[in-house]
């Protein structure tokens, strides 16, 4: 499992707080952008082709469990783009 989270220096007009690249145990790769939005964090994940074909419920469960946030998030999948919104303070990668 290869996990990385890179915080970026932010200009006052920039809401981007970092990006994530991960390869899961089954070899699926994804990249995510992390943006602050008021008191919430919007996670945008670009799924690999193999992950796209795995099915909505698997993708949602697998990615959410990888981020170790379960209850306080809303998930949405549109094509190969996966989004979820959660309170910023509960996100383990940007505390």
Curated annotation (Swiss-Prot):
Function: Could play a role in innate immunity against viruses.
Disulfide bond annotation, renumbered to this chain: none
Species of provenance: Homo sapiens
Protein's UniProt name: Putative protein RDUR
Superkingdom assignment: Eukaryota
Transmembrane segments: none
Chain intervals for the UniProt region annotation (Disordered): 1-20
UniProt-listed GO biological process terms: innate immune response
Keywords, ordered alphabetically: Immunity, Innate immunity
Bias (Basic and acidic residues): 1-12
């Amino acid at each position: 499992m290869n996990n990385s989270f890179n915080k970026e220096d932010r200009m006052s007009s920039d809401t981007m707080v970092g990006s994530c690249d991960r390869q899961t145990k089954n070899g699926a790769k994804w990249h995510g952008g992390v943006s602050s939005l008021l008191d919430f964090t919007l996670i945008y994940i670009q799924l690999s082709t193999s992950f796209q074909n795995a099915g909505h419920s698997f993708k949602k469960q697998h990615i959410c469990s990888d981020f170790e946030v379960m209850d306080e998030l809303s998930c949405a999948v549109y094509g190969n783009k996966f989004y979820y919104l959660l309170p910023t303070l509960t996100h383990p990668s940007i505390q």
